[in-house]
């Protein structure tokens, strides 16, 4: 019986009082075989096609005013988040994307850099974004307040969306995993096993979707300041 359901997210692996769980964020660089870097294979060809597709889509979202090479940042962001989401599905591996410490670290600097660049280099454009076209004069102050609040909470919504989706799926899998050992019926155990497999497939889809949503929204926020 678990004393705390959220204990699965605790960064508790330590050596000499130093937390090692956050190293799981970069564990992919250690476990990827060197052959992936030296010669093309099926995995690398598929992955390159995925990255090329994302590059084209992000380039379209950024528009003609987007800076050259800016899509590399968003494609890398997608790869980092998706890889860590998938790592969290493996047993005994720390899920770094289920913590606001990581998600806010990714979202807030991006949003802040976009805002600083926009307000310094494109001040009139940023002021124009505060009032949608066709807004009646009486509603302009109200719309400015709404747009300002929506801009300020953007990094928080980005971070919380990713964290909440990762936590929700892991909690369901943890609950089912703790229910199985207490059951003596083979029928119930079979149903729990099938449900666990279905949840694992669902979580795999969520891992891809949430990393894609995070990268796409970051790209859209960047396109607004150009």
Swiss-Prot record:
PROSITE patterns in the cross-refs: ATPASE_A
Protein's membrane topology: Multi-pass membrane protein
The family this protein is said to belong to: Belongs to the ATPase A chain family.
Entry keywords, A to Z: ATP synthesis, CF(0), Hydrogen ion transport, Ion transport, Membrane, Mitochondrion, Mitochondrion inner membrane, Transmembrane, Transmembrane helix, Transport
Cellular compartments annotated: Mitochondrion inner membrane
InterPro entries, sorted: ATP_synth_F0_asu (IPR000568), ATP_synth_F0_asu_AS (IPR023011), ATP_synth_F0_asu_bact/mt (IPR045083), F0_ATP_A_sf (IPR035908)
Molecular function terms, GO-annotated: proton-transporting ATP synthase activity, rotational mechanism
Stored Pfam families: ATP-synt_A
Main location (coarse class): mitochondrion
Residue intervals passing through the bilayer: 20-40, 74-94, 100-120, 162-182, 187-207
Name by which UniProt lists this protein: ATP synthase subunit a
GO CC field: mitochondrial inner membrane; proton-transporting ATP synthase complex
Keyword Ribosomal protein among record annotations: no
Stated role: Mitochondrial membrane ATP synthase (F(1)F(0) ATP synthase or Complex V) produces ATP from ADP in the presence of a proton gradient across the membrane which is generated by electron transport complexes of the respiratory chain. F-type ATPases consist of two structural domains, F(1) - containing the extramembraneous catalytic core and F(0) - containing the membrane proton channel, linked together by a central stalk and a peripheral stalk. During catalysis, ATP synthesis in the catalytic domain of F(1) is coupled via a rotary mechanism of the central stalk subunits to proton translocation.
Gene: mt:ATPase6
Superkingdom in the source lineage: Eukaryota
Subunit record text: F-type ATPases have 2 components, CF(1) - the catalytic core - and CF(0) - the membrane proton channel. CF(1) has five subunits: alpha(3), beta(3), gamma(1), delta(1), epsilon(1). CF(0) has three main subunits: a, b and c.
């Amino acid at each position: 019986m678990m004393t705390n359901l959220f204990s699965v997210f605790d960064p508790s692996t330590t050596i000499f009082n130093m937390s090692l769980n956050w190293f799981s964020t970069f564990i992919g660089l250690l476990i990827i075989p060197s052959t992936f870097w030296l010669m093309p294979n099926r995995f690398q060809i598929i992955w390159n096609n995925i990255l090329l597709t994302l590059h084209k889509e992000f380039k379209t979202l950024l528009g003609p005013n987007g800076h050259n090479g800016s899509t590399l940042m968003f494609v890398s962001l997608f790869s980092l988040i998706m890889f860590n989401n998938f790592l969290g599905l493996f047993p005994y591996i720390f899920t770094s994307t289920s913590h606001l410490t990581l998600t806010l670290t990714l979202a807030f600097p991006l949003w802040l850099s976009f805002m600083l660049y926009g307000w310094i280099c494109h001040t009139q454009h940023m002021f124009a974004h505060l009032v949608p076209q066709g807004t009646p004069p009486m509603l302009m102050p109200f719309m400015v307040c709404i747009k300002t609040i929506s801009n300020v909470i953007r990094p928080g919504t980005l971070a919380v969306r990713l964290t909440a989706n990762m936590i929700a799926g892991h909690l369901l899998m943890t609950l089912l995993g703790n229910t199985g050992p207490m059951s003596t019926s083979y029928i119930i155990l079979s149903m729990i096993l099938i449900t666990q497999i279905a949840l694992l497939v669902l979580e795999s889809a969520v891992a891809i979707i949430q990393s894609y949503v995070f990268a796409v929204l970051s790209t859209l926020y960047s396109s607004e300041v150009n």
